[in-house]
């Protein structure tokens, strides 16, 4: 998806480095220093314009949240939303989430969110999917024991691939939804801006799973 350039973005980001991290590696193992309270840490990879992560932070003041986004013009919009929200339990990171294990310590993360990731539909691009085995290995490194991975998409092909990938990796499924918005089991459903725009075109799929613990 092509994102329109925002001339104000870089200046705004430079003015709000208390809410935005541009060099995450030095914070490995010490992310709690970015928050006023030491609380369980939840991370969204590909946070977009921030609607999901901001609402999560608002509804869960007893958790700390980090939203990772690589596109400058997109994360600038998210940053403006974070600043305007006044919430102190959320930080944004301007980087590529593919290398998550290089800037989070083992077991530092309580939960991970993957919302509407790029489906990379061509077979030669399979390894780029955020639910491919190489990325699952990174998530397994940083998640605490039984920390949840929550994956949501509107792409049936990507969802089916992801179910197989998670299963082959030995993950334990806690819930699978083939039409999340029609669910009646009380599952938490905080929507992204993309989700609100496109959910009328078809079902939203979700899986929640965790990695097995070593006995």
Curated annotation (Swiss-Prot):
- The residues that the entry says bind S-adenosyl-L-methionine are 44, 69, 96, 118
The answer to whether the entry has keyword tRNA processing is: yes
One GO CC term on file: tRNA methyltransferase complex
Q: Which UniProt keywords apply?
A: Methyltransferase, S-adenosyl-L-methionine, Transferase, tRNA processing
EC assignment: the record states 2.1.1.33
Q: Which PROSITE patterns match?
A: SAM_MT_TRMB
Name the InterPro entries on file. Answer: SAM-dependent_MTases_sf, tRNA_(Gua-N-7)_MeTrfase_Trmb, tRNA_methyltr_TrmB_bact
- Single GO term (MF): tRNA (guanine(46)-N7)-methyltransferase activity
Task: List the active-site residues.
Answer: 118
Pfam families, per the entry: Methyltransf_4
Enzyme type, top EC level? transferase
Residues holding substrate: 122, 154, 192-195
Its UniProt entry gives the catalysed reaction(s) as: guanosine(46) in tRNA + S-adenosyl-L-methionine = N(7)-methylguanosine(46) in tRNA + S-adenosyl-L-homocysteine
The pathway noted for it is: tRNA modification; N(7)-methylguanine-tRNA biosynthesis
Its biological purpose is as follows: Catalyzes the formation of N(7)-methylguanine at position 46 (m7G46) in tRNA.
Q: Which HAMAP family match?
A: tRNA_methyltr_TrmB
The UniProt family comment states: Belongs to the class I-like SAM-binding methyltransferase superfamily. TrmB family.
What is the protein name given in its UniProt record?
tRNA (guanine-N(7)-)-methyltransferase
What organism does the record attribute this protein to?
Answer: Levilactobacillus brevis (strain ATCC 367 / BCRC 12310 / CIP 105137 / JCM 1170 / LMG 11437 / NCIMB 947 / NCTC 947)
In the UniProt record, what gene is named as encoding this protein? trmB
């Amino acid at each position: 998806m092509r994102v329109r350039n925002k001339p104000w973005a870089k200046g705004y980001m430079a003015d709000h480095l208390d809410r935005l991290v541009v060099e995450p590696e030095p914070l490995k193992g010490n992310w709690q220093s970015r928050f006023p309270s030491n609380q369980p840490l939840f991370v969204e990879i590909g946070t977009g314009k921030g609607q999901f992560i901001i609402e999560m932070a608002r509804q869960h003041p007893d958790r700390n949240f980090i939203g990772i986004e690589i596109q400058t013009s997109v994360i600038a919009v998210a940053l403006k939303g974070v600043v305007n929200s006044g919430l102190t339990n959320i930080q944004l990171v301007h980087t590529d989430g593919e290398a998550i294990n290089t800037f989070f310590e083992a077991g530092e993360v309580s939960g991970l969110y993957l919302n509407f990731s790029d489906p990379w539909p061509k077979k030669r691009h399979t390894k780029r999917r955020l639910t491919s085995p190489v990325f699952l290995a990174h998530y397994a490194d940083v998640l605490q024991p039984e920390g949840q991975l929550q994956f949501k998409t509107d792409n049936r092909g990507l969802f089916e691939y992801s179910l197989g990938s998670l299963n082959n990796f030995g993950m334990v499924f806690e819930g699978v939804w083939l039409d999340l918005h029609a669910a009646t089991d009380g599952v938490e459903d905080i929507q992204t801006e993309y989700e609100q725009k496109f959910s009328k075109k078809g079902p939203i799929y979700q899986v929640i799973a965790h990695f097995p613990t070593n006995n």
